[in-house]
Amino acid sequence: MNLTDKVTIPTQVMARTVGDETVILDLTSGTYYGLDPVGARMWQLMGEGQTLAAICDTLLDEYEVTREALEGDILRLTEELRAKGLASPA
């Protein structure tokens, strides 16, 4: 995936926040994945249909981080979610 891509969240995937953690669960396979608050914000923006580049721009305004580090984090999280079947390229 690259930063111009958007992410699709399958209909069988649900997310719930418990305390400071957001848990993503695939109801069909039982696969789950935990997100910290920054990862949860990325997930929220992915669900809004934004490109990964737009998500990066939004998060740069919200967190003190370099663009390079954030782009790497976004691409890494997206790839982990894709590998687990919790998200796919749109």
Protein language model annotation of sequence segments:
Residues 1-40, 44, 90:
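Acidic, low-complexity/disordered tracts enriched in E/D and polar residues
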Residues 31-90:
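Long, charge-rich, low-complexity alpha-helical segments
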